[in-house]
Amino acid sequence: MPVRERPSMIVRPRPNFLQLFFIMRGSVVPRILPQIFGFAVYSAVILALARWFELDLGVFNITPFGLVGVTLSIYLSFRNNAAYDRWWEARKLWGTLVFEIRNLARATTSLIPDPAEQRALLMEALAFCHFLRGQLRKTDSIKDARAFIDAQAETVAGFANPADEMVRRMGRRANAQRRAGDVDPIGFRILDERLASITAIQAGCERIAGTPLPFAYTLLVHRTAYIVCLLLPIGLISTTGWATPLFTALIAYTFFGLDALSEELEDPFGTEANDLALDGLCRVCEISVFEALGEAPPKMLPAEKFYFS
């Protein structure tokens, strides 16, 4: 069967209270650790200087920082919601693709009398799934596609849009069956409708992959988060004292953690911890197709330390 890439989506049971603070796999903490540690050290330096020079920072009130923090939280919430909408729409599109592949398998085995032609068309459908996954992840999917269409995979990979070429090939194969009289016009229309739905799914995925969130939002959030964390120790020292580095690190964790999570969800087709398990969804399509053909299906891809690829 096709060779798989490194795992991406993490699925695990809800951790208990003690595990909650020590889980790193699937957490954004490793990505934002430099910011957390850096601002903790920075606030410790500010605190030490204030104590050494006996500076009176009581004139700095925490209220303005709270107002800025609320504003930043609103922007982070908007960006997080927008990123999650992209992630959820991508998941729905791939769920619909599984649905359409099953419909295509059922229609193909019912309407095309020749078992060899049935298998050829459905193998092209599976190659389409893998080419689409490769295009969305910007990875080489020739090895995966070769398992279903043999040497044709190299030829198809030479097209600007290999997944679209696979749909065209399926359409030509279905039309050849119609011209030969093996499939009547109504049956051909059913097959063509399935291919049209698959094309619409591909276009939806390409729209998400090709349209990132506006850069201005990212820039605004990053600038504001850094400014708040840089000025925050000055406003906290008079009230939190020696605990200032701890509170600064906690606030940095919140702001930069939400930002990092939004960045992961913004591109749902990648291979990070919270991206979609496209390899697993392709395997679901493979199982459905092989069962429709009456052949032994492959097994589901196992999780690797709670990760599904």
UniProtKB/Swiss-Prot annotation:
<protein>
    <recommendedName>
        <fullName>Voltage-dependent anion channel-forming protein mll4386</fullName>
    </recommendedName>
</protein>
<dbReference type="InterPro" id="IPR021134">
    <property type="entry name" value="Bestrophin-like"/>
</dbReference>
<dbReference type="GO" id="GO:0005254">
    <property type="term" value="F:chloride channel activity"/>
</dbReference>
<keyword id="KW-0406">Ion transport</keyword>
<comment type="similarity">
    <text>Belongs to the anion channel-forming bestrophin (TC 1.A.46) family.</text>
</comment>
<dbReference type="GO" id="GO:0005886">
    <property type="term" value="C:plasma membrane"/>
</dbReference>
<feature type="transmembrane region" description="Helical">
    <location>
        <begin position="32"/>
        <end position="52"/>
    </location>
</feature>
<keyword id="KW-1003">Cell membrane</keyword>
<feature type="transmembrane region" description="Helical">
    <location>
        <begin position="58"/>
        <end position="78"/>
    </location>
</feature>
<keyword id="KW-1133">Transmembrane helix</keyword>
<dbReference type="Pfam" id="PF01062">
    <property type="entry name" value="Bestrophin"/>
</dbReference>
<keyword id="KW-0472">Membrane</keyword>
<feature type="transmembrane region" description="Helical">
    <location>
        <begin position="227"/>
        <end position="247"/>
    </location>
</feature>
<keyword id="KW-0812">Transmembrane</keyword>
<dbReference type="InterPro" id="IPR044669">
    <property type="entry name" value="YneE/VCCN1/2-like"/>
</dbReference>
<keyword id="KW-0813">Transport</keyword>
